[in-house]
């Protein structure tokens, strides 16, 4: 995805308070009838990022002014093409629990991937370590997108 028109930028900033890591959300520019581009500090862990994304998705869905054609995108710096690139995630449903499915690929913070796949027709779920940085998450998302996998669930599990 290269060019997005009619969008609102949403920023999630990295902040600290003593030894605590915090996320600061700048949602003042979020217009529910537009496409939303999420610019997220790569140092933030998923355990802080995902609850904020869930809240913002719910706000957009509940708006009387939402557009049925508007999308949500993560932005990232594409170092190969030297530009800002986007990953769509409008249909993605984040779950803050471990999956009940028998078909899951789990990506850990230390770079390991574990899979438990059954020979069935159920969609394969993706799971991510809640302590993984957003940068690591985006790197996995880019790799998964390039594989053009079929039958991947629209739910992602962060645990």
Residue ranges, per PLM feature:
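Long, low-hydrophobicity, acidic/polar, solvent-exposed interaction domains
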Residues: 1-159
